[in-house]
């Protein structure tokens, strides 16, 4: 039985998958298995996997595309290791990741998972030091070291932790049923919040022991709606005992519903969009943006899209968009 199970879910990224798998094969700690779970890729992923003649590599190919979370779960359910990590097919581990994270879990029985800091890399596997430093500061990773004192705050308020740079005890993931399919698109956020609510203990290594790839380009409207629906599901499913934290949850939920309502109106789902905008405005109050979106929802789609595109030109770019521009 391997000590560590490394799960790499993949879909149509054969070119990046090679880099990801080789980063595991080159680890200084070698007691692992690699589980590549393929969500019915239509590229040459099966042929790429065949090049590795190593009994530690297991390949699970889904018969049909079932979505990210379901594909990830298939790898988790197949895992045999005491410890478990999942990272995406376009990311990578630095050579000492397993050695240093395994040492913490071996030496500290009360710790359920170990997170590390990570690099930002571009399409050519080049590290961007400025983007890495900014990312670390934005998400509060640069102030963490050792046992994480308030895991729920780090997971829910600051969103400091990332699944792809974390080694877990597999049994702690089993205790919370790992990833929920309904959270597809914001699995990291949801998993860490549920681990915190279950009383699990996290540990943070400030070294940069993983590489996270940022891609250029914009996210599509369909992708944005998918993410916002998943985030709304997650926020609706939590209930915090602490009064102030519960207030934050309700405020965040209202904000997500407003953002989702705006995008549904843009997508032509007018009735559902208006309903969410009205619901969120009860908590946030009506704004000029919401009022305008409600008016636009009664206009033909061609007019609606024209005005939306014009307004978008004046919207300041968010953090993710700025980073994508830098690393692309």
Task: Annotate the PLM regions.
Residues 84:
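Short aromatic/hydrophobic "clamp" motif used to bind/position activated sugar donors
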Residues 30, 38-47, 64, 88:
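A conserved acidic beta->alpha catalytic loop
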Residues 62-79, 89:
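Glycine-rich, basic loop-to-helix element that forms the pyrophosphate-binding segment
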Residues 1-25:
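N-proximal low-complexity "stem/linker" segments adjacent to membrane-targeting elements
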Residues 200, 207-216, 220-247, 266-284:
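Catalytic core of nucleotide-sugar-dependent glycosyltransferases
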Residues 70-72, 99-104, 110-172:
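Flexible acidic/His/Gly-enriched loops in nucleotide-sugar-dependent glycosyltransferase catalytic domains
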Residues 2-5, 33, 190:
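Cell-envelope/extracellular polymer assembly enzymes that use nucleotide-activated donors
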Residues 139-226:
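Conserved nucleotide-sugar donor-binding catalytic segment
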């Amino acid at each position: 039985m391997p000590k560590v199970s490394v799960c790499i879910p993949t879909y149509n990224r054969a070119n990046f998958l090679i880099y990801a798998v080789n980063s595991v094969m080159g680890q200084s700690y070698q007691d692992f298995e690699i589980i590549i779970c393929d969500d019915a890729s239509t590229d040459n992923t099966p042929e790429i996997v065949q090049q590795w003649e190593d009994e530690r590599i297991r390949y699970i190919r889904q018969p049909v595309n079932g979505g990210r979370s379901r594909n990830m779960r298939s790898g988790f359910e197949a895992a045999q290791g005491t410890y478990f990590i999942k990272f995406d097919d376009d990311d990578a581990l630095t050579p000492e990741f397993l050695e240093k994270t395994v040492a913490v879990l071996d030496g500290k029985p009360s710790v359920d998972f170990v997170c590390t800091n990570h690099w930002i890399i571009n399409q050519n596997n080049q590290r961007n030091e400025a983007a890495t430093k900014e990312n670390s500061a934005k998400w509060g990773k640069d102030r963490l070291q050792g046992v994480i004192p308030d895991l729920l705050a780090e997971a829910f308020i600051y969103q400091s932790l990332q699944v792809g740079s974390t080694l877990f005890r597999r049994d702690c993931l089993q205790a919370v049923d790992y990833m929920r399919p309904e959270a597809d698109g914001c699995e990291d956020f949801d998993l860490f919040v549920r681990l915190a609510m279950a009383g699990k203990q996290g540990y943070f290594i400030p070294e940069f022991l993983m590489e996270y790839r940022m891609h250029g380009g914009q996210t599509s409207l369909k992708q944005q709606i998918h993410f916002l629906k998943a985030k709304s599901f997650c926020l609706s499913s939590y209930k915090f005992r602490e009064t102030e934290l519960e207030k934050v949850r309700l405020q965040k939920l209202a904000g997500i519903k407003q953002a989702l309502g705006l995008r549904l109106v843009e997508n032509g789902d007018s009735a559902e969009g208006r309903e969410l905008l009205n619901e969120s405005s009860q908590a946030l109050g009506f704004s000029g943006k919401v009022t305008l979106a409600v008016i636009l929802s009664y206009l033909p789609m061609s007019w609606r899209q024209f005005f939306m595109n014009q307004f978008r030109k004046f919207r300041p770019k968010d953090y993710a968009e700025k980073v994508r521009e830098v690393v692309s």
